[in-house]
Amino acid sequence: MAMWRPSDNKVYLPPTPVSKVVATDTYVKRTSIFYHAGSSRLLAVGHPYYSVSKSGTKTNIPKVSAYQYRVFRVRLPDPNKFGLPDPSFYNPDQERLVWACVGLEVGRGQPLGAGLSGHPLFNRLDDTEVSNLAGNNVIEDSRDNISVDCKQTQLCIVGCAPALGEHWTKGAVCKSTPGNTGDCPPLALVNTPIEDGDMVDTGFGAMDFKLLQESKAEVPLDIVQSTCKYPDYLKMSADAYGDSMWFYLRREQLFARHYFNRAGNVGEAIPTDLYWKGGNGRDPPPSSVYVATPSGSMITSEAQLFNKPYWLQRAQGHNNGICWGNQVFVTVVDTTRSTNMTINAAKSTLTKYDAREINQYLRHVEEYELQFVFQLCKITLTAEVMAYLHNMNNTLLDDWNIGLSPPVATSLEDKYRYIKSTAITCQREQPPAEKQDPLAKYKFWEVNLQDSFSADLDQFPLGRKFLMQLGPRPPRPKASVSASKRRAAPTSSSSSPAKRKKR
């Protein structure tokens, strides 16, 4: 007899619904008011490989390299406290104003050039490209003076939050599997904000060289005790709000120039089933830890990303260029202007060339200029919008002087009558805590544009380019010479347009 049985398959319940993230264009209303803001010439001078401390403790000369991130934190004025020409176009009781970035140009000075980086004691054993004999005679110290032209990178990331970087560092060892001294440490991928002065990937990997390379001889001097970070494009693109990256520009190129192997013991030996044992000094085989020195190849002005305007029509995330917190973060890398200037000074008056009497120095210079076009926008303070903004960033409503009512207390509270009496516990109210900058512990290049806004767009290069994008505009009416001078009445000899048509 046939019998019905319920299905043995598992029943999958739908996931718990989550709050939907909406684009800023759904609750931000854009106006027809635009402003231009630009920085002054931004300069940096320092040593390209390391910082120099002449007094022993204080850094006299900072490290300034073309392979460093330049992270500009651009401060904008509060539009709700801004002197507007016509403040009647919005209601401050029901609306708030915000800035939207619609145009940007990063200007770069200085000529194109390739700067070298290297190490006078670089760990290279053999030239594995043209080696004539594979030997295993490893001496105590085979380091050599090697210089390279590193990977070529042009990068620009724009957002209202710091860009996020990723790198590999030493991970934690499980207690159940303790390691021995000299074992390869476990690796862990970590995310940290990209700060001004952090090193970019130069072709040797995004990793913490200070923790993962104890020999101090595997990479050039400028990164041997540093951490090279690479922008985490995947995580920033997947960000729910898209504040850290509205858009980005990227161009990278390199090729392998020289091929070496490393001196030292091979910690993980080659399995014996991968080769036949040989003689004449080939057993055991030489080091199989290979490394290639990178080269950024040719630098040309035809492949430049800077010194040209970019217009933001649609961001890659939900934040379409709205400057929350009245700030913009611009993360820049440009290694096409990496020339290191050689400067020398004689220790005494020279009568002939003597290298022993000449001190040699290295300096690298950076030159930037930032220009923006901002659009004034309005947000209507409805209950739904305020609740959404509070969940997104709870400091926004505080900055707008909008407070949330605390819940009504359901328990019985104590209230003393004589609050100044010394017979009871101190009833003095604690002063409100000062507002702390959540990004104060990070290093950025501060650029203050609070006094640099101008509505006369045609007076600035980027403003004129922006007006050209809008199309031709009607000419301004000419001012009359005299207010009392009236237009002359038509004479009998002059014919009206209607009469001309009849003729």
Curated annotation (Swiss-Prot):
GO molecular-function term, one example from the UniProt record: structural molecule activity
Biological processes annotated in GO: endocytosis involved in viral entry into host cell; virion attachment to host cell
Compartments it resides in: Virion; Host nucleus
Region of interest (Disordered), ranges: 468-503
Record flagged with keyword Disulfide bond: yes
Alphabetic keyword roster: Capsid protein, Disulfide bond, Host nucleus, Host-virus interaction, Late protein, T=7 icosahedral capsid protein, Viral attachment to host cell, Viral penetration into host cytoplasm, Virion, Virus endocytosis by host, Virus entry into host cell
Database matches in InterPro entries: Capsid_L1_Papillomavir, Capsid_L1_sf_Papillomavir, dsDNA_vir_gr_I_capsid
GO annotations of cellular component type: host cell nucleus; T=7 icosahedral viral capsid
Role: Forms an icosahedral capsid with a T=7 symmetry and a 50 nm diameter. The capsid is composed of 72 pentamers linked to each other by disulfide bonds and associated with L2 proteins. Binds to heparan sulfate proteoglycans on cell surface of basal layer keratinocytes to provide initial virion attachment. This binding mediates a conformational change in the virus capsid that facilitates efficient infection. The virion enters the host cell via endocytosis. During virus trafficking, L1 protein dissociates from the viral DNA and the genomic DNA is released to the host nucleus.
Family: Belongs to the papillomaviridae L1 protein family.
Complex formation: Self-assembles into homopentamers. The capsid has an icosahedral symmetry and consists of 72 capsomers, with each capsomer being a pentamer of L1. Interacts with the minor capsid protein L2; this interaction is necessary for viral genome encapsidation. Interacts with protein E2; this interaction enhances E2-dependent replication and transcription activation.
Entry protein name: Major capsid protein L1
